[in-house]
Design a protein with these regions (language model features):
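Alpha-helix boundary recognition
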Residues: 71-72, 152, 186, 204
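His/Asp/Glu-enriched, well-ordered alpha-helical/loop segment
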Residues: 106-186, 190-193
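C-terminal cap of metal-dependent C-N hydrolases
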Residues: 182-223
Length: 223
């Protein structure tokens, strides 16, 4: 516990000195303690709840309910996108992202207090239809748009609200001051979507067209 407090305090001071967010991005597991350690720090020290961004909050239903309580106290929470949630729902207790966001909103949580991430292209277990572990895949960044589409098409949330979870909210929380908005002085990062399907039509990164008419124009990792 003391080491965790020290890490949180050091990150906070480092953020202040460097002009960066200085938050702790906490990867949560399946354990029954949920967010207990984070909540203890918030209640027993002067470190604010905004110092933490717990992720994987939708990995099971009991962890998600704990995350709802955490968000009620002003905490920000991060969902992990999953392009194969239809299969995962059959064999795990994972909470579908769009369902979780609807639940947060119905609980009175601010639309500013949640984000969606892909786990940074991290490892993602693969299972057979019977639930047997088959190996590791990759948590794809494309899951972000998929989750936004489900928020709109499955839960009928306004597009502008769903987009906050992958644009302005993470930019604000991480203090990425040139990201998250289309405005003078911001990076020219824009995605154009087909009106009905919300599939990608055009991608512009820092003013450069990367995808046009759904066809990539830039393919190299470092281009």
């Amino acid at each position: 516990y003391e080491e965790f407090v020290r890490l949180a305090a050091d990150a906070r001071v480092g953020g202040m000195l460097s002009g960066k967010a200085g938050i702790l991005n906490i990867h949560l597991g399946d354990g029954a303690r949920h967010l207990d350690l984070i909540e203890r720090v918030v209640h027993e020290t002067e470190i604010p709840v905004t110092q933490f961004l717990p992720t994987h909050i939708n990995r099971n239903s009991h962890l998600f309910e704990a995350a709802v309580s955490f968000a009620r106290e002003g905490g920000c929470v991060d969902f992990t996108g999953n392009e194969d949630i239809d299969s995962w729902e059959k064999i795990t207790d994972e909470v579908r992202v769009c369902t979780g966001i609807r639940r947060l909103l119905d609980a009175g949580i601010s639309e500013n207090n949640f984000t969606i991430s892909s786990d940074g292209q991290g490892s993602l277990p693969r299972f057979s239809p019977s639930g047997q572990y088959e190996g590791l895949g990759i948590g794809k960044a494309s899951s972000l748009l998929k989750e936004v589409r489900e928020c709109v098409m499955r839960e009928h949330l306004p597009l502008e609200l769903a987009l906050r979870a992958v644009t302005s909210n993470p930019a604000r929380i991480l203090k990425l001051n040139t990201k998250g908005h289309i405005a003078p002085g911001y990076d020219g990062d824009i995605c154009l979507l087909h009106k009905d399907s919300l599939l990608l039509h055009t991608v512009i990164a820092k003013g450069r067209v990367m995808v046009r008419n759904s066809v990539p124009e830039v393919r190299g990792t470092f281009e």
